[in-house]
Amino acid sequence: MAAGVATWLPFARAAAVGWLPLAQQPLPPAPGVKASRGDEVLVVNVSGRRFETWKNTLDRYPDTLLGSSEKEFFYNADSGEYFFDRDPDMFRHVLNFYRTGRLHCPRQECIQAFDEELAFYGLVPELVGDCCLEEYRDRKKENAERLAEDEEAEQAGDGPTLPAGSSLRQRLWRAFENPHTSTAALVFYYVTGFFIAVSVIANVVETIPCRSPTRRPPREQPCGDRFPLAFFCMDTACVLIFTGEYLLRLFAAPSRCRFLRSVMSLIDVVAILPYYIGLFMPKNEDVSGAFVTLRVFRVFRIFKFSRHSQGLRILGYTLKSCASELGFLLFSLTMAIIIFATVMFYAEKGTNKTNFTSIPAAFWYTIVTMTTLGYGDMVPSTIAGKIFGSICSLSGVLVIALPVPVIVSNFSRIYHQNQRADKRRAQQKVRLARIRLAKSGTTNAFLQYKQNGSLEDSGGGEEQALCVRNRSAFEQQHHHLLHCLEKTTCHEFTDELTFSEALGAVSLGSRTSRSTSVSSQPVGAGSLLSSCCPRRAKRRAIRLANSTASVSRGSMQELDTLAGLRRSPAPQSRSSLNAKPHDSLDLTCDSRDFVAAIISIPTPPANTPDESQPSSPGGGGGGASSTLRNSSLGTPCLLPETVKISSL
């Protein structure tokens, strides 16, 4: 009975649990996988690197390449991927933009390459996030300036070399813009610099008062009036040099209109124009005052030094790039001058014998105070005037000091940019020099190739052309290997006989073999054997009359390789496989000899029916023969007095 109760009691309890109300509301449905319609995982293969993302992620930006139907042109049906032959590191930032909606600019990547990737995927640079936007614009601006400078240098002919068919104008403009291209350009560069210095010094010295000892009483007068002929001759010589330079620059300029509108062209005109106006101006007292005014413009000749000084050019570029900051400084100073001049005028208005008679008269005091000069010709006397004068001085220091760091940073940036440009030009010159050296090396190799008999003359008469001699592939590999050995061992290897002469100096037979064997035996200095042995083909057997080595063990196949030995200048020796000095060879011998290296390989038992078995002159007639075959492929062995090549 107890056993029966124990059996059905758990089922009763389970049923009772089902009767009790466990929750007041119905239970939620069982969790399941919700099928997402229209969303799938897309695989994007960028140069072998696979990226996976949702289709809806890319569809958020339908105006781009990945978000539009244009990406279907890059779909590979075999792999089921979208393949793009682009930079995978850049694509990581592009894909993050689709995921997060923020585009970041990588610092370690080239800004131009980044722009190209954005243009390919249809993204505009304005999508760059605020965290990277300022740095992106600075880098892009710097890169644009560098490219503009390179383009100007290329148009001006400031490159390392000019084309062979360059015109006279191009050569002249290159000489003016880059004086270090030739000796004549460098001489003209220093001559013009000398005359610029003479002109500036003469313009200063002619105003120095000089005493005239001939007049009684002595009277001081300017040196220009005392020695008019000397100063006129110096001025004439300088102006002639400047005029010739200006006309030559105008003739050689790539764009004459652009040259006439340039700042340096205007400086040249202003430097030489007063001379010609004074030369043709009538000597009349009524117009002498205007001529004296025109002579003031001669001081602008000093700006011609900017062509001869890289620092002055950098300073000009800096001021040009800081135009907005300088405009802000000028506007701020103008406002402060007007405000403090008005305050100082009303503060000093009630005093007797004051110098602040009007607001424009107070401008001078405000300018001198804000620039911290303080001449002392105008001084406030009231307490209010002194207080406002102190405030004016402090505000001037703050206003002037604000744009200074920006100007300094721009100067430093342009300076380092010019340094990098000079370094790139120097590296480009080095690369071009290496290319010319390589070309000259190729020419020398061609001449050596011809000297070694690899080229022959074809045709007759005066017109003879060089053509490559028809050689077997085996012989071509032989010459190629010799060339490689010369480069690696710094020794020169030469053949005693050409390939055709070596074949004509021996008698050939017929023999077939499956494998290659090598044996070398000493022969006369005037004979050399070589042949080419392809696989499973009939091979020529060479029987030597003066063979000194014989094979006594079974039927052996031997391939003899002979190579010419010449005296090596290197004192040290190098060994190689397949290279072995013969016992009877005198290493101190200066004459050429041939060395034998024997590698024996058992002959296969099966022979072709047409195989001939020549008897060895030194053997015992056991079916073995000394077969000599010369393979032109060789490996050098440099002995103390000889150089030996033995081939596989």
From Swiss-Prot:
Glycosites: 352, 355
Name this polypeptide is given: A-type voltage-gated potassium channel KCND1
Location of the protein in the cell: Cell membrane
InterPro entries assigned to the protein according to its UniProt record, in alphabetical order: BTB/POZ_dom, Ion_trans_dom, K_chnl_volt-dep_Kv, K_chnl_volt-dep_Kv4, K_chnl_volt-dep_Kv4.1, K_chnl_volt-dep_Kv4_C, Shal-type_N, SKP1/BTB/POZ_sf
Chain spans, region Required for dendritic targeting: 474-489
Role noted for this protein: A-type voltage-gated potassium channel that mediates transmembrane potassium transport in excitable membranes in the brain. Mediates A-type current I(SA) in suprachiasmatic nucleus (SCN) neurons. Exhibits a low-threshold A-type current with a hyperpolarized steady-state inactivation midpoint and the recovery process was steeply voltage-dependent, with recovery being markedly faster at more negative potentials. May regulates repetitive firing rates in the suprachiasmatic nucleus (SCN) neurons and circadian rhythms in neuronal excitability and behavior.
Transmembrane keyword on record: yes
UniProt subunit comment: Component of heteromultimeric potassium channels. Identified in potassium channel complexes containing KCND1, KCND2, KCND3, KCNIP1, KCNIP2, KCNIP3, KCNIP4, DPP6 and DPP10.
Binding residues annotated for Zn(2+), in chain numbering: 104, 131-132
Family in the record: Belongs to the potassium channel family. D (Shal) (TC 1.A.1.2) subfamily. Kv4.1/KCND1 sub-subfamily.
Chain segments carrying region Disordered: 144-164, 601-636
Region Mediates dendritic targeting, residue ranges: 474-489
Organism per entry: Bos taurus (Bovine)
